[in-house]
């Protein structure tokens, strides 16, 4: 076998997923250089709109996570604070606002925006974040307002409200970019998006096996593609390849998790990107693997028609009632035979962290699994204590081991 053929044969899904992310940024930069209008987009803004129009957008949340993971989160956060923003403001927002102020990013080059696409189903603070960008740069902001849903289903009046904004966003983006909506293309994008979402969720579902065929932190790394390229065939193919690899790992007893899986845990919250390696290393020390999370799977948006598409964007984790949010976690724990939980009290994400103390109490009460929490931040390393985290994980391990010995 030639070296070239060997390389192709051995190429894994993770390599294709990295290439998709790199291509995403490259194409946006090239579009900007050609004089096309490009935008910054919220992670749970309906991606079907920009994809159908062929408009290039980048995702500040993805970008801020990459900057933080590469060790530059603190510098960017401090720059934003020097601009007048409080340390209490979301770390992703501070990183992104610093990039906006500087006008470029050394860590991961991105084009400056000609418009912003905002959606508040994952974060209410995002409205003010994007408003500031729009005002500072004097560019249009398109907002799709998703009402907080306290019900078990999404009512028809909510669907109509979201649909009206969806249609208006298309018209606004047509005017801004000069591109025209193609209904046939939209149908194709929806079909591909469903294929991507189903394969992504299929890959995540293999965590139910003991041992899990993958390290739970793999999902956090691969999630960027679920955000930025869900409507592309490349993403659908790569996620199918990933799911197939995990399926094969189940059959052969292999796993991307290094070492023996001794404990299975739920990880609740956004990853602390500046300390991702430290967190993973400490969990691995006790043989703990993340087998349950709702964060990564939040981008597996499933629908069969337009009404269901509107409803799907009203059912993401941060736009639903506490009881429904609890049900998501209970299902994640019970469906994967998870035995403990680690909860990230994220100083950047008030909307998410605000209910986590009660979630921890109810989760422990209704499942009987031990739960610990730690303080941290998704982008600002100053809000994370290695010593506190290490002590909490050590304590969780002791309780989990004692429970097993008592059974």
UniProtKB/Swiss-Prot annotation:
Enzymatic reactions: (R)-3-phenyllactoyl-CoA = (E)-cinnamoyl-CoA + H2O; (R)-3-(4-hydroxyphenyl)lactoyl-CoA = (E)-4-coumaroyl-CoA + H2O; (R)-3-(indol-3-yl)lactoyl-CoA = (E)-3-(indol-3-yl)acryloyl-CoA + H2O
Known pathway: Amino-acid degradation; L-phenylalanine degradation
GO aspect biological process, one term: L-phenylalanine catabolic process
EC number(s) reported in the record: 4.2.1.175
Keyword Disulfide bond among UniProt keywords: no
Keyword match 4Fe-4S: yes
InterPro entries given in the database record: FldB/FldC_alpha/beta (IPR010327)
Listed Pfam families: HGD-D
GO molecular function, one term: hydro-lyase activity
Cofactor binding comment, as recorded: Appears to contain about 1 [4Fe-4S] cluster per heterodimer FldBC.
Top-level division of the source organism's lineage: Bacteria
Propeptide: 1-4
Keywords per UniProt: 4Fe-4S, Iron, Iron-sulfur, Lyase, Metal-binding
Known cofactor(s): [4Fe-4S] cluster
Subunit structure: Part of the heterotrimeric phenyllactate dehydratase complex FldABC, composed of (R)-phenyllactate CoA-transferase (FldA) and a heterodimeric (R)-phenyllactyl-CoA dehydratase (FldB and FldC).
Assigned protein family: Belongs to the FldB/FldC dehydratase alpha/beta subunit family.
Described purpose of this protein according to its UniProt entry: Component of the phenyllactate dehydratase complex FldABC that is involved in the fermentation of L-phenylalanine via a Stickland reaction. This complex catalyzes the reversible syn-dehydration of (R)-phenyllactate to (E)-cinnamate in two steps, a CoA-transfer from cinnamoyl-CoA to phenyllactate, catalyzed by FldA, followed by the dehydration of phenyllactyl-CoA to cinnamoyl-CoA, catalyzed by FldB and FldC. Requires the activator FldI to initiate catalysis.
Protein name: (R)-phenyllactyl-CoA dehydratase alpha subunit
Organism of origin: Clostridium sporogenes
Underlying gene: fldB
């Amino acid at each position: 076998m030639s070296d070239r053929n060997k390389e192709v044969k051995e190429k894994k899904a993770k390599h294709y997923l990295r290439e998709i992310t790199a291509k995403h940024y490259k194409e946006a930069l090239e579009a900007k250089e050609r004089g096309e209008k490009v935008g910054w987009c919220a992670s749970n803004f309906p991606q079907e709109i920009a994809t159908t129009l062929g408009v290039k957008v980048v995702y500040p949340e993805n970008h801020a996570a990459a900057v933080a993971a590469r060790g530059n989160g603190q510098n960017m956060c401090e720059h934003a604070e020097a601009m007048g923003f409080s340390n209490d403001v979301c770390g992703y927002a501070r990183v992104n606002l610093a990039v906006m102020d500087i006008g470029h990013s050394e860590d991961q080059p991105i084009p400056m925006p000609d418009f912003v696409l905002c959606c508040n189903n994952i974060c209410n603070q995002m409205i003010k974040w994007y408003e500031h960008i729009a005002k500072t740069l004097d560019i249009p902001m398109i907002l799709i307002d998703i009402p907080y849903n306290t019900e078990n289903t999404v009512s028809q009046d909510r669907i109509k409200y979201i649909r009206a904004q969806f249609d208006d966003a298309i018209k606004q983006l047509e005017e801004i970019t000069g591109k025209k909506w193609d209904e046939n293309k939209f149908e194709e994008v929806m079909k591909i998006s469903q294929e991507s979402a189903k394969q992504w969720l299929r890959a995540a579902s293999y965590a139910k096996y003991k041992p899990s065929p993958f390290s739970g932190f793999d999902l956090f790394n691969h999630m960027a593609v679920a955000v930025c390229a869900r409507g592309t065939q490349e993403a659908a193919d790569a996620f199918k390849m990933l799911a197939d690899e995990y399926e094969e790992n189940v059959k052969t007893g292999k796993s991307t998790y290094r070492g023996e899986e001794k404990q299975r845990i739920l990880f609740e919250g956004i990853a602390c990107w500046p300390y991702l390696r430290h967190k993973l290393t400490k969990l691995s020390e006790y043989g703990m693997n993340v087998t349950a999370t709702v964060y990564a799977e939040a981008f597996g948006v499933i629908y069969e028609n337009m009404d269901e598409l509107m409803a799907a964007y009203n059912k993401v984790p941060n736009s639903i009632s506490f009881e429904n949010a609890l049900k998501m976690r209970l299902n994640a724990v019970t469906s994967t035979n998870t035995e403990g939980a680690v909860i990230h009290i994220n100083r950047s994400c008030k909307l998410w962290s605000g209910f986590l103390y009660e979630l921890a109490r109810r989760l422990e009460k209704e499942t009987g699994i031990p739960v610990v929490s730690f303080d941290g931040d998704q982008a600002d390393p100053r809000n994370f204590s290695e010593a506190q985290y290490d002590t909490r994980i050590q304590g969780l391990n002791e309780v989990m081991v004692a429970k097993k010995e008592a059974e």
